Amino acid sequence: MKTLDELITERRSVRKYLDREVEPAKIAMLAEALRLAPSACNAQPWRIIFVTEKALKDKVTSEGLGGVVPNTWAKSAPVMIVACSELSLFTHKLAESVQGVNFHLIDIGIALEHLVLKATDIGLGTCYIGWFNEKPIKKLLNIPSSWKVDCLITLGYPEVVPEATPRKPANEITFINKV
């Protein structure tokens, strides 16, 4: 088993996948990682859809991606994860009205990081996609109006594991006590 530091260091945005099914047992492991993620007041606002059926995944990809950034590479992924937030939760509505903070986005970000690190741990690759057309995705997947599609994540066995991309030094992005 790899350490957390190794998983954080090894995680990459994968854009080329093998034509290989992701086993249901591995999807269950990812679901468990999501389930254990912390959230504001333990509200667990995320609703995650694993689209594994090829015909449906292809429709989600063709109808949901496009526009300025078409992300055509996403079609090679055997699984498309559709990450949604339940917007009708009282805790999150209160926080947004009082503090102007969208806690559902913070919560889902934490949960999805659990997912991508677990995916890395079990030999799977992922890539976040933030540019998509929500309306056709909601229609194709019968997503309720009270849910917001926050992002998509491709999932599968990497055909190519990309090299690490340059990162800013820690002293440029972190501060102790004052800026």
Region roles according to the model:
Residues 27-35:
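A structural motif
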